Each structure stands twice: as C-alpha cells, then as structure tokens.
Amino acid sequence: MPIFFYLFTTLIIISSLCVVLSKNSVYSVLWLIFTFINGSGLMILLGAEFLAMLLIVIYVGAVAVLFLFVIMMLDINFNQAITKLRENLSLSIFITLIMFADLVITIILSTKNINYSSNISFAIANNISNTKAIGNVLYTEFMLPFQIAGLILFVAMISCITLTLKKRDRIKHQDIRKQLSHNKSNVILMTKPILNKGVENIKYE
C-alpha cells in the first residue's frame, strides 16, 4: 500500500507540473485529466470509493472534457500568449514567490503545536456504506458550508455569463412587439413610380 501511495503522489506532482509548464493548452488539459485519475487512485487507497468515482465522473468526464472542447473550438494564438507571458514574467514570478512564502508560513505556523500519533483509529460501521456515511455527514454537520459552496458556484456561473454576454449590433434580430403592432396602414405603401426611374425615398423597418 505505501508503494502505491508514493506512486500516485509522485505521478500527481509530475502531472501537475506538466499542466503548468506545457506550452500547448490541449496537452495541459490531458495532463490535468491524468492528475485527476491519480487523485482518484489515492481516494481508493483511503477507502473512499465513492469520492474516487465522483472525481472521475465529474472532473474528468465533465470539467476536463469541457475544457478540452473549449480549447479545441477557440482559435488561440499560442505565440502571442507566450509573448504576453514573457512581458509580465517578472510580475508573475514575484506574485508566485509571495504566494509560496505565504503557504510555507501558514503550514509552519499551523503545524507548530500538533502532536503526531500513529495510534489513531476510526470506528467504521459495517452496515453503513461509503455513500451513506458521506451523506450523513454532509447534510447534517456540514449542511451550511455545503449550501454556501453551492451559492458561491451559482454566483460564479452568473458572473461568467454576465462577463461573456455581449450585445452584438451587427446581428439582425426580430422585434416581436414591433412585428405584432404592424397592420395594413403602416405596412402597405402605395406609390406612383415615374417611368424608368424606379421607386425612391422608401424607409424599411
């Protein structure tokens, strides 16, 4: 079991680095899928088969595939993106170092007064499945954080739609109210065109 743990952990670290360092976005998504698969392997080692299945079905089957479709459909200029990244490389490195230092300080301060013990055991009932145990905890003790997380995701979805929704003036569209208000008097126009000159000064709506 420790061999598989270190194997999955090493593969997760390597694939995560490949996600960040890959120049091609399609390769980054493929490495991300590989990361999720190894993460599900860790869940199986911990005995959480339901979480492993959710990680495969939701993250790999929905989110990662959605990323892949979006990247394949978008016409991304990778050379231009790399040029912009090089222009802001110093700022990116500075922000990364600050976040890394913050993470290290947080880990050191949070684990300073922890007493480690290897004689820790958890009572697991044989008549309760993995899914039922997660549901009992999720909808009782963590009901409020679960609802708040759903609300945050809903707000993020609405924000993405608002930011990407643009009004296009060049596209022709129908005005149902104006179409229903038309009648014979404002639709039919009787004219007397001059011979060989055609009809002029007619406004179409």
From Swiss-Prot:
The portions of this protein that span the membrane are 1-21, 26-46, 54-74, 89-109, 142-162
Entry superkingdom: Bacteria
Keyword entries, A-Z: Cell membrane, Membrane, NAD, Quinone, Translocase, Transmembrane, Transmembrane helix
Query: Where is this gene product found?
Result: Cell membrane
**Single GO term (MF):** NADH dehydrogenase (ubiquinone) activity
| Pfam families named in the record | Oxidored_q3
- According to its record, what are the GO cellular component terms? plasma membrane
Catalyses which reaction(s): a quinone + NADH + 5 H(+)(in) = a quinol + NAD(+) + 4 H(+)(out)
Q: What is its EC number?
A: 7.1.1.-
Q: Give the main localization category.
A: membrane
Topology of this chain in the membrane: Multi-pass membrane protein
The enzyme's main class, written as a single word, is translocase
What the record says about family reads: Belongs to the complex I subunit 6 family.
Q: Which NCBIfam families match?
A: PRK06638.1-4 (NF005164)
What is its biological role?
NDH-1 shuttles electrons from NADH, via FMN and iron-sulfur (Fe-S) centers, to quinones in the respiratory chain. Couples the redox reaction to proton translocation (for every two electrons transferred, four hydrogen ions are translocated across the cytoplasmic membrane), and thus conserves the redox energy in a proton gradient.
**PANTHER family, from UniProt?**
NADH-UBIQUINONE OXIDOREDUCTASE CHAIN 6 (PTHR33269:SF17)
Q: What is this protein called?
A: NADH-quinone oxidoreductase subunit J
Q: Which gene codes for it?
A: nuoJ
